[in-house]
Amino acid sequence: IMSNYNSVTPEFIDELKTLLGEKYVKTDADTLDRYKTDEEADERCFHLPDVVVIPADAEEIAGVVKLCNKYLIPLTVRGGGTGIVDGAIADKGGVVLLMERLNKIIELNKEGLYMVAQAGVRTLDIQAAAKAENLLYAGDPSSSDSCQIGGNLATNAGGIKAVRYGVTRNQVYAVQIVTPYGDIVDLGSPLKKCSTGYCMEQLVIGSEGTLGIITQVTLKLQPLPPYKIDMLAIFHDPMAAIGVVPQLVKAGIDPTSIEYMDNPNVRTTSEYLEFPGAPHVEDGIYVIITIETFNEDELDMKMEQASDICEAAGAVDVLEADERIWSMRRNCLESVSLISKVCTTDDVVVPVDEMSDMIQYIIKTVAKYPFPLRINAHIGDGN
């Protein structure tokens, strides 16, 4: 409740500057305006913070938390700002705390197959550091080029590889957090098996800052499959497109990704990215399938098997997908700006076997209203 908080005072600002240094305490109008929204940029949800702080480490974050408690000032933590549900917006004013200076990879253990990183490291940089050692960090949200690993944990982010490797919580050994009281606590450890007490690190993952501020993470790594193919299966019937998912899984193909774009998405993203030559742009529904293996013969076999399954299910074409196709998938949300300044985004998860029912329901329901509809999905995991 707003009345439980106090307004920011000059004394509070002065204490922040003493703690962090004047350079890292921002109250100018341009900075405050920059952090009034997240990726959705819905004007109805704009909220200006009173002050933006940029701490360097967990100790400074703990100090900020203690000061906010002392003065009863609301505190909002912001990672990459790529969310679309207002989680990084200071709806009660107060402090927005940026994680951008906590941007170091502390350790990459090739023998133990884990990485220790600060929470402000970009997910793309986590992936690149692992790949440089022929290892894989399997978390891969669509916004990996700009989101931060701490935000991935805070929201239990999914992504394009979840069908094979699981979501963010499946990639985490341990976390360090600053509690709401300003204590620094380490939870979990890089052990394959640990039956000592509760798995508190798993409780923190997905808690969206309500249990503490994630400052450091220990991530699982695994060998990087050397052989890979990206396939594009093109359908005209959305139910046929969705129907290939259980068939691919039951066939033992073990795809890394199965992504879905309806035709309105295909048309809008191709225009947004100036890619008029996108395959079947006028009528195609896209299913993007990634297969990765440790054996070239196995890759060839699974690729042929997947192609046969798609064609039998009604695919009008099965092609090799290049980076332009993946760019279309990653830009589904951004491309909506071509058709409307206002966009309502819903993120729905259902059991995989109910995916077709959900999409049919969405199409039928929205058809009652004069709104354009775009559907994209991680259909391999029901999201």
Where are the language model's segments positioned?
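Active-site cofactor/substrate anionic-group-binding motifs, chiefly glycine-
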Residues: 74-77, 82-86
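Generic secondary-structure signature for well-ordered alpha-helical cores
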Residues: 8-10, 14-25, 70-73, 128-135, ...
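C-terminal substrate-recognition/cap domain of FAD-linked oxidoreductases
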Residues: 28-37, 223, 234, 242-383
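N-terminal flexible segment immediately upstream of the FAD-binding catalytic core
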Residues: 1-66, 83-113, 142, 265-276, ...
